Amino acid sequence: MLGRPFLALVEGFGRIAVLFFSAMAWAFRPPFRLRLLVKQLEFVGVRSFWVVVITGAFTGMVIALQTYYGFRMFSAESLVGGILALSVTRELGPVITALVVAGRAGSAIAAELGTMRVTQQIDALASMAVDPVQYLVTPRILAGIVMLPLLVVMADFVGYVGGYFVGVKLLGINSGMFMAKTLELMEMSDLMNGLVKAAVFGLILTTVGCYKGYYTSGGAEGVGRATTDAVVISSLAILISDYFLTAVMF
Amino acid sequence: MIELVDVCKAFGRQRVLNHLDLAVEKGETTVIIGRSGGGKSVLLRHLIGLMKPDCGQVLVDGQDLARMNNRQLKEIRKSFGMLFQDAALFDSMNVGDNVAFPLREHTRKRRAEIRDIVEEKLASVGLSGVSDKMPSELSGGMRKRVGLARALALDPHIILFDEPTTGLDPLMADAIDTLIRDTQARTGATCVVISHDLAGAFKIAHHIAMLYEGRIIAKGTPDEIRNTEDPVVRQFVEGRADGPIKVV
Ligand SMILES: Nc1ncnc2c1ncn2[C@@H]1O[C@H](COP(=O)(O)OP(=O)(O)O)[C@@H](O)[C@H]1O
Ligand SMILES: [Mg+2]
């Protein structure tokens, strides 16, 4: 006996996978919808810029503060720079950025496609011989995969700068030591692996948003439900997949 | 020629279409009447392949839509135009872009040419100079007319209308009916119209078919339907709550 919820979960997984793979197959078949892609790159990426900068900066700042208080007990304050760089590039940059973008863009994608579904705009596309998956889903998922790593580079950068500011300017750690330990502890692969995570998270949050929106039913209430579900499910999926990606990569 | 042969469609336990047969004559208008929730929209969606039947065939010029792959469906849909119940205009585009959409997707016409066709189609539904408005700025009747202009953009051979007059005031409803009748006469297209507005149906139809309990229980010319002996059809046509159809 597997139980209904488990079966529903497996079925949901299957349907998400089918949507994802058909969207990706459409990416390689004409017509190439460059203008729609650019619009989504702008929506997912450019318009998340400031919120990512602010969350990134404060994340770096609080990490510097916390590690400083911890490491001061062993007179190891100089390690703050290295720990900051590692935790931001490996974990906090990708995860926090992805959660923020899931809340901002993932929910908006679900709401937009959900509204198009319940007002029959998706059927209208199909009736006019345009594939709705290619028209609506493909550009959004591509935008997620491309834009999340770029946003995370930004978040990593401002996170480190914010941490540097707190550690060196406010708490008085020696600037040379701070930098030296950063270079000693961190490797290029830490940054790169973080960006791979970011791309996976970008894929997850846009695919879940598209899936929930595309299969919305039940009017305005259904759109509301799809939007909430998109955020909850993609947040869970991001955190769970983060564990497994970390286990594989580091 | 469109033919539905022995079509079934169920959602879970609910049987919506139950071994339904219907033939739609080429170049004429067939109006399908029936109760709300009776499966009229489901029937119409089968005609353009938006839904696939559980059993049976949907034949368009002899080809079975139910067995087509995506590419074949796409090809055949280019000869269809469909007006949805609430027009289903793209609310992220203005009126002009909505009407231009199928032209941009499926023709290699130039910008100026498309603009001219859009203006012409909008004029033919009595809406000139609204190209730059957004759908949200329009009244229900105007939205339907823009939806009609969009459905006509590619000069389709087959036009499907899902409740084109529901929710409109009687004058606007009559204007839309006139538009449908004139469009059909002008283009010679095969039209399938879903409606529960009997007055409108009698005005535009060459044939009227009644959908009841998942089947077409009667089909005939407007006169035949008006004078039918069938108690179910009589009750519907006369609009009485008492009779063989259980209303509540
Ligand atoms: N996609 C669907 N999933 C489940 N049930 C549906 C779906 N589409 C229609 N139905 C059901 O089929 C019945 C007929 O619907 P419809 O064809 O829209 O009726 P109408 O004659 O008013 O157009 C309704 O009871 C509706 O709930
Ligand atoms: Mg309907």
What are these regions (language model features)?
Chain B
Residues 48:
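Helix-to-loop junction immediately C-terminal to a conserved catalytic motif
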Residues 63-64, 111-129:
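Conserved ABC ATPase "signature" region
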Residues 134-138, 142:
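Conserved ABC ATPase signature
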Residues 153-157:
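A short, proline-enriched helix->beta-strand linker immediately N-terminal to the Walker B motif
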Residues 159-162:
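Catalytic Walker B motif of ABC-type/P-loop ATPase nucleotide-binding domains
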